[in-house]
Amino acid sequence: MMTNAAQITKQRNSGKRHRACERCREQFELNEPYFLLGASSWHMRCFLCAQCMDPLVGTTYFQFENRIYCEHDFKTLYAPVCAKCNEFVIGQVVHSSNNSYHLACFTCDECNVHLNSQIAYRYQGTILCFLCNQKKPKMRIYNCNKCKQHVDNSDLLTYQENPYHAYHFKCTTCKKVLESDARTIKDDLFCPRCFDFKCEVCFDCKKVIDPQVEQSIFTMNKHWHTDHFRCATCARPFFGHEHYEKNGKAYCRDDFLELIGHHCFICDRNVGGGMVHVFGKAFCPECYRCRGCDKVLHYKDKVMELDLMPLCKKCLGNKTFQKALKYKSL
């Protein structure tokens, strides 16, 4: 990797074959100025960033794997980010516990002593020198089952009942290096994002149902959080109680009867399938009575119509009732 090491020279008539541009492969004209970078040559117009194609003449540039980049694109594509100052690391880099640091930033988080010549200790997400680590209250110590080194809680991944540094593993699906929040399905490890893709989604809240920590129910050909499977009208969860379906929605008994039933002509109650339908009206069993004697009728009883109300056979043959009815009609 080189920066600003190119020289501007001119094609001379030496009798040898003219140089060719590294980008366009065209030869340089006689006395044409060009960039000479190591063993490669470039037209002035072809000396561009391989990523954004911006001109690099007069700017800071980097050569990496025989390609040239502007400073911004090189940092974005290849430069690590310091875990302490969050700036790009150009030049010497220190790697520790799956993080990168500037040499000057690799210091103890307590006393700021440089850690370049001593062992760094991880403690609850911080980096400490030996003395500062000794002052901290001791917690349960885990040693990685793979590298046998100490595992800080922030890096701890328990897999098959053994402690590991999480960064020793990669996601089964996307191959991303795992962190301590990795999830397990059978013996396979996944990052949280890929784990979510393996889970069902609640039809009500549209969020992932975590089968390892959340209860769910499968009904109406859909998955639900247990407390999200509820009546479409009153929103009370069913929690395993009986529900009724209509047009793809679930209802409790009261709201279902309200939705599909008929109201009693007398008391205005809704009793669903127990209603008696006669003369264009609906009656609940308690209100289905004779218009004449107020006797409770059975739905199989033969009745006659009087003012669009039921009249029992006995009242119809009663002479006293017939006289009263005749007098009323006068």
From Swiss-Prot:
CC per GO annotation? axon; cell-cell junction; cytoplasm; focal adhesion; nucleus; varicosity
Which top-rank group of organisms is this from?
A: Eukaryota
| Primary localization | cytoplasm
**Which residue range or ranges hold the LIM zinc-binding domain?**
21-73, 82-132, 144-194, 202-255, 264-315
Sorted alphabetically, the Gene Ontology BP terms of this entry are: cell-cell adhesion; cell-cell junction organization; positive regulation of integrin-mediated signaling pathway; positive regulation of substrate adhesion-dependent cell spreading
Q: What tissues is it present in?
A: Expressed in neurons and intestine.
Which key words tag this protein in UniProt? Cytoplasm, LIM domain, Metal-binding, Nucleus, Repeat, Zinc
Q: Where found in the cell?
A: Cytoplasm; Nucleus
Which GO molecular function annotations are given, in alphabetical order? metal ion binding
Name used for this protein in its record: LIM domain-containing protein pin-2
Q: Which organism is it from?
A: Caenorhabditis elegans
